[in-house]
């Protein structure tokens, strides 16, 4: 099994705010991606008002250490999300191709 960890976030965006959220994520993502232990960061639009992200870290410790930086990175989009529009799951990477 890998020692890498991944974080998956589902963002449900308020009606009419999708472009603003995408712009904010594009602005903030490079800074977060450059943090120690962050191996990759991807965002995809998965619905009319939904974006999902996947961040892969070199370890669960790196995922946990970068938690405050993730909160800071996402602070600019939280007000643009629908009520209950942020759902996060984390886990250990078990298959990598």
Please state what every model-predicted region is.
Residues 1-6, 10-12, 38-52, 75-97:
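Glycine-rich beta-strand-turn "strand-cap" elements at beta-sheet edges
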Residues 6, 25-26:
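A generic structural signal for ordered secondary structure
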Residues 12-23:
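Short, surface-exposed ligand-recognition loops at beta-strand->loop->(often short) alpha-helix junctions
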